[in-house]
Amino acid sequence: MGSGLPSKSATGHGKRIGLLSLGWGCLLLTASAACAAAPIHLASISRSHHHRLHHRHRGVGVQPNLRSTEALVLDTTSHKVLYARRADVPVPIASITKLMTTLVVSEAKQPLDEELDVTSDDRAIGRGASSRLAVGTHLSRAELFHLALMASENRAAHALARNYPGGVTACVRAMNAKARELGMIHTHFVEPTGLSSNDTSTPEDLSKLVMAASQSAVIRRYSTSRGYTIRSGRHMVAYHNTDSLVDRRSWHIVVQKTGFTNAAGHCLVMQAVIDHRTVVMVLLNSWGKYTRVADARRVAQWMKAKPGHHVIRQVASRA
């Protein structure tokens, strides 16, 4: 296809990804000078203590009834907020953290075809951490990107951070520095997987991360991949995307990431094209496994029913 990226393996096949010796220059799209000069500013939102803004344009109609506790829908062209709920409240973000991990690792421009090992250090990343990657598994850096973004593989994300120049500590430091660079003033990271409830952010901040991540061809490709199979130990292990919307032809998703912990609830962030408009959705702390996807569908249906309107509703300040 001429993208210069390592080729994807078809789902269900035990073929390793085709590795190519590539320069990172073709993988990362450089943001415009204007974007680099200043952080993205969202539409003005009231921040008075315990204040909620309920604003509705005359004749607009009913807002989407979302189940996510914190949410934001942003038009990336106009930078206008179409929908917001508790958009400036810092909360745990679970594996949405991996979007920042892969962003800073990609910017280090380490070889994608370099073979890396999954070690016991990657196993000891947190109580109850799920992973199907056996210690001793050999994977390329590209494959670790693939699994961390598509399947939210905890050991894959940790291995990427562990092999970052300076190790995990340096990677987390770079993640926080990148957050400041992007204007994510209410975001803080303590580790690279999202398993810690101390990895926190707001919907407003995460919209900036999603837009920055959308500039990376690696993140775009692997976060929207449908499936991939690897050899882990003695077994072939098939992985699938944790976001079922990538399988829907009716959805044009540019970049996405899911997350879940007990502290964070079910989370989903994405950049998608809906009704010819590019939007960022941030949906945090949904109460059910399928609620985050249902909320995304509610937003899409609302946008298609009310094209062209810019509405802000249910915005709460930090308590």
PLM segments and residue spans:
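Active-site-adjacent loops and short helices of periplasmic peptidoglycan-processing enzymes
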Residues: 40-204, 208-217, 274
